[in-house]
């Protein structure tokens, strides 16, 4: 148990020290991953009941910005996705 806790603490310290960004738009500047980042942002906004979203630079950091939240975009139909899989 102690070893597992120590490992997790060291892993967390490494991630913080490396300044790794785990946001949905973190890889929006990589040409191949740009479309994937955009898709993840739209999905994230949809889960927040917004119509759409896009990756923007805010204060020099990639950020997912959601739009049309007042109108809502509904949820992703998880039931339909589960039935397909």
From Swiss-Prot:
The keyword Membrane does not apply. One of its GO terms (cellular component) is extracellular region. InterPro entries: Abf-1/2 (IPR031770), Abf-1/2_sf (IPR038204). Expressed in the pharynx (at protein level). Detected in pharyngeal neurons and secretory cells. Residues 1-17 form the signal peptide. One of its GO terms (biological process) is defense response to Gram-negative bacterium. Keywords: Antibiotic, Antimicrobial, Fungicide, Secreted, Signal. Its main location: secreted. It is found in: Secreted. Residues 82-85 form a propeptide. Pfam families: Antimicrobial25. This is Antibacterial factor-related peptide 2. The gene is abf-2.
